[in-house]
Amino acid sequence: MYLKSIEINGFKSFANKIVFEFPQGITGIVGPNGSGKSNVADAVRWVLGEQSAKQLRGGNMQDVIFSGTETRKPLGFAYVAITLDNSDHNLPIDYEEVTIARRLYRSGESEYLMNGVSCRLKDVNELFYDTGIGKEGYSIIGQGQIDKILSGKPEERRELFDEAAGIVKFKRRKSMSVKKLEEEQQNLIRVNDILSELEK
């Protein structure tokens, strides 16, 4: 699996639609200060489900929408799409290519798309479990994140290693199963109480 392209339109400093295409192999984005490199990284984090405007270096989520300049009007939406080559089927989906997109309007309305079909943030998160690609994955390291990791709490570092080792999805499934089991045990207690009352 590798990143094939990033399409950005109306996101932060990208007023016009731009498509970055990446050949297979190691890829980097270089450029002078202020040219938008960090905004590209923010765009990838955003399309993967980042919900914190602070993590995207903004005050609120509408700050990701191009706000205009002296010569350009503000735009009414931001759109980002990433396309991944999935020919090795690292992602649990039966497509050779997977495109995840996110659109946000100034009204606050937003949507996620998976291969052009509307989906939930939960679907995007589940697709990327244990790949290191999720919004909190180790594959996207923003400004200041290394210091945060090194000075972070042991539990936070453990979460990062769990993600890298591929055991996060099992922990989440276990947690959901334990919760369901507890709910069923409570239901069983209620049924037994009702049966006891009926037998009296």
Q: What function would you assign to each model-found segment?
A:
Residues Y2-K200:
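Gly/Lys-enriched N-terminal cap/neck module of very large, oligomeric protein machines
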